[in-house]
Amino acid sequence: MIKRLIIIILLFIWSCEEATFEQDNPLDPDNPDYDYPTVTFISSIAEGDTIHVSDISFDWQGSELVAEYRTKLDDNDWLEWNDQLSFEIEYLDEGAHSFSIQGRYSTGVSSIIVTKNFIVDAITGPALVFFPRRKIASQGDNVTFQILAEEVYNLSAAEFRFTFNPSALQINSLTAGSAFGSLGEVIFITEIDNNGGSVSISTAVFGD
């Protein structure tokens, strides 16, 4: 009976000992020295700057242990997470844009999103511009472009022609836009040559 009692007491004392663990894991939020991930732009334009080209590069850096980043232009979807620290954007359209970055640890903890707003003013008008400048499509897709009059004022008539590669695409239709507003009756004459790869447009407005 005495031996059994001693064994019981020893087991009880062992099970009540306080366990201690080293909290030195930098990715453990319970670590008193834990820092949340951060991302910072480097070597980029200032907030709200205007650029006079249609392409731009962004560079950034994350805090220690940030493993991946993702980026987003304007209201487009986020790109996939990767370990790149720079990104180049080409064929930007005229006007206001925003570029956003977010980083995360390997544990999945993400940083706050940082955003840089800027304006593209790459065209010195008067000029005719395709909008958007670039659109990526697959074979068989139908896509729509606009032709904009950039820095053109008091326009009453226009005539122009553009060419394209007929082995890569064909023009299905052309419609008049709203460049003339409500100034009067709009005349819109087009000629599409899908064999030769050219389009001619003549348009004018007749007011009262």
Question: Positions of the model-derived regions?
Answer:
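Low-complexity, serine/threonine/proline/glycine-rich extracellular segments that form mucin-like
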Residues: 136-183
